[in-house]
Amino acid sequence: IVCILGTGSNSCFYNGKEIVNNVSPLGFILGDEGSGAVLGKLLVGDILKNQLSPAVKEAFLKQFDLTAPEIIDRVYRQPFPNRFLASLSPFIAQHLEEPGIRRLVLNSFIAFLRRNVMQYDYVQYPAHFIGSVAYCYREILQEAAQETGVSIGKILQSPMEGLIRYHTVPCDQL
């Protein structure tokens, strides 16, 4: 089971030769659970609906110098709202000590595992992850996996790590 958690999210079952199953990611509006875009969407929603502490809301508005109408404009009227929302991930990473933000990430990863990974044979095969979101929040991803009974294999930040290993390590040592 191979999963990508970056700006968007995706998953598939790869049999060693080809992809034999894929749960459609559906994009950040209908799916993309666990992605940077969805984490950003959840963060903005929680901030604008006063679900996080006043200190976090103030820090967010100060750091990004945005008003609520400007955020709405960026999401609904400007191109590439998914990229804008995903660009908020570093703020999330900086504020993981805030229980509401940590819970936001954990719940999104649990949703990704349930709605995507658990549609494959996750009992027999571990799920391997690649992408900046998977890597940066790997401890929370492990917690979500433990809660859902999904076994995690490798978590890589970039595909280059695996490609370099594949092309430099003898085949019998991969």
PLM regions with names:
Residues 1, 42-174:
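ATP-binding/phosphotransfer module of carbohydrate and carboxylate kinases, centering on a glycine-rich
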Residues 1-55:
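Phosphate-binding/catalytic loop of phosphoryl-transfer enzymes
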